[in-house]
UniProtKB/Swiss-Prot annotation:
<dbReference type="InterPro" id="IPR027417">
    <property type="entry name" value="P-loop_NTPase"/>
</dbReference>
<feature type="binding site">
    <location>
        <position position="19"/>
    </location>
    <ligand>
        <name>Zn(2+)</name>
    </ligand>
</feature>
<dbReference type="GO" id="GO:0005524">
    <property type="term" value="F:ATP binding"/>
</dbReference>
<keyword id="KW-0067">ATP-binding</keyword>
<dbReference type="InterPro" id="IPR019489">
    <property type="entry name" value="Clp_ATPase_C"/>
</dbReference>
<dbReference type="GO" id="GO:0008270">
    <property type="term" value="F:zinc ion binding"/>
</dbReference>
<dbReference type="GO" id="GO:0140662">
    <property type="term" value="F:ATP-dependent protein folding chaperone"/>
</dbReference>
<dbReference type="Pfam" id="PF07724">
    <property type="entry name" value="AAA_2"/>
</dbReference>
<feature type="domain" description="ClpX-type ZB">
    <location>
        <begin position="4"/>
        <end position="57"/>
    </location>
</feature>
<dbReference type="InterPro" id="IPR050052">
    <property type="entry name" value="ATP-dep_Clp_protease_ClpX"/>
</dbReference>
<keyword id="KW-0862">Zinc</keyword>
<dbReference type="GO" id="GO:0051603">
    <property type="term" value="P:proteolysis involved in protein catabolic process"/>
</dbReference>
<feature type="binding site">
    <location>
        <begin position="121"/>
        <end position="128"/>
    </location>
    <ligand>
        <name>ATP</name>
    </ligand>
</feature>
<dbReference type="GO" id="GO:0051082">
    <property type="term" value="F:unfolded protein binding"/>
</dbReference>
<dbReference type="InterPro" id="IPR003593">
    <property type="entry name" value="AAA+_ATPase"/>
</dbReference>
<comment type="similarity">
    <text>Belongs to the ClpX chaperone family.</text>
</comment>
<feature type="binding site">
    <location>
        <position position="16"/>
    </location>
    <ligand>
        <name>Zn(2+)</name>
    </ligand>
</feature>
Length: 424
């Protein structure tokens, strides 16, 4: 075989026998017995061969699966509190990936799938726990909002779009997607609107639960490649959802009353009712910790759907002390993030202890949990972050309780040495 760089012996223009490009359109043209191939076609053939080989012998991950204790310790670095929920998640996730590594069938015993239901107030850390798990295990992760889902054929988002989003996260690598984690938020919002069957179809409530059943339990979903629309002549990607871990989360507002009603059935009403003192009041967290499947059915989830989420974890309502910890202790704590932002301007940022308490109290008053902390700090530091890049000789910004309450602006401390040098 020879490399052709110019015209043939008779000056005739030569073309690639595969793609038809002339020798002037490519870098190299290789000649064989009465055929020619260009460098671009050679590269394309190499890609095809590499892809075929990788499909025949996929690389198995040899990395050791972290133990439940190691998973819990990693969660502790990013999520404050919620000890019971972390333990439940660590065991469920470990068992799920152990099942994937060793096969669904062990010594003739078929191993079931353990999807997870997280119940907890807004801002208690449900989404953060799921995100942190995916990052720790280095698997694809996607989130879906249950309120946008509808049954197939109705206006809204089809449940199979969830799998499409997961594929997008890993460049449509099906094998990788099948080891991923899907978090479905606001799952309580698709509860059945009524205990009684209705003649009108509930396409965003019970209908979505029915549509999610097979997906969560395990089915082979047909997903159009690269996000295209479905049409009959199209080739679909086949994704086995039995290997995907589904975590569903919701605040379940009002579920505590369902639990309380079950626990105090028959205590009487009116003069016969049981009267409890203030010290006997049960907290929201303690009531939710006592949730049973029958309570979820009464709330509006269908029994079949609850059966597909066998692992239940309840998250505690965050108190002031926990919110202060969240502000300071995790690896990506909010105060650390803002300190880093100010450090880029060569300015030190200090949050005094009374400021942290004031931020936590404000978040509790708003009932936004940890989710509301950032908006409070952003609002307080807005003017400072706006003016700081144009200011000179600033060495430190101090935020105290009065700043959080809106009674004063952050304290600005100037570099005295630079000021003295400027005055001289």
């Amino acid at each position: 075989m020879t490399d052709i760089k110019s015209g043939g012996d008779n000056g005739k223009l030569l073309y690639c026998s595969f793609c038809g490009k002339s020798q002037h359109e490519v870098r190299k043209l290789i000649a064989g017995p009465s055929v020619f191939v260009c460098d671009e076609c050679v590269e394309l053939c190499n890609d095809i061969i590499r892809e075929e080989i990788s499909e025949i012998s996929p690389k198995e991950s040899k990395e050791a699966l972290p133990s439940p204790i190691e998973i819990r310790e990693s969660l502790d670095e990013y999520v404050i509190g919620q000890d019971h929920a972390k333990k439940v998640l660590a065991v469920a996730v470990y068992n799920h990936y152990k099942r994937l590594r060793n096969g669904d069938n062990h010594n003739g015993i078929e191993l079931g799938k353990s999807n997870i239901l997280l119940i907890g107030p807004t801002g208690s850390g449900k989404t953060l726990l799921a995100q942190t798990l995916a990052r720790l295990l280095d698997v694809p992760f996607t989130m879906a909002d249950a309120t946008t889902l509808t049954e197939a054929g109705y206006v809204g988002e089809d449940v199979e779009n969830i799998i499409q989003k997961l594929l997008q996260k890993c460049d449509y690598d099906v094998e990788k997607a099948q080891r991923g984690i899907v978090y479905i938020d606001e799952i309580d919002k698709i509860s059945r609107k009524s205990d009684n069957p209705s003649i009108t179809r509930d396409v965003s409530g019970e209908g979505v639960q029915q549509a999610l059943l097979k997906l969560i339990e395990g089915t082979v979903a047909s997903v159009p490649p690269q996000g295209g629309r479905k049409h009959p002549q199209q080739e679909f990607l086949q994704v086995d959802t039995s290997k995907i871990l589904f975590i569903c989360g919701g605040a379940f507002a009002g579920l505590d009353k369902v639990v309380e009603q079950r626990n105090h059935t028959g205590t009487g009403i009116g003069f016969g009712a049981e009267v409890r003192g203030k010290d006997q009041e049960i907290s929201l967290t303690d009531r939710l910790a006592d949730v049973e499947p029958q309570d979820l059915v009464k709330y509006g989830l269908i029994p079949e759907f609850i059966g597909r989420l066998p692992v239940l974890a309840t998250l505690r309502e965050l108190d002031e002390a926990a919110l202060i910890q969240i502000l300071q202790e995790p690896k990506n704590a909010l105060t650390k993030q803002f300190t880093a932002l100010f450090d880029m301007e060569n300015v030190e940022l200090e949050f005094r202890s009374d400021a942290l308490h004031a931020i936590a109290r404000k978040a509790m008053d708003r009932k936004t949990g940890a989710r509301g902390l950032r908006s409070i700090v952003e609002a307080v530091l807005l003017d400072t972050m706006y003016e700081l890049p144009s200011m000179e000789n600033v060495s430190k910004i101090v935020v105290d309780e009065n700043t959080i309450k809106g009674e004063s602006k952050p304290i600005v401390i100037y570099d005295s040495k630079q000021e003295q040098a400027a005055s001289e």
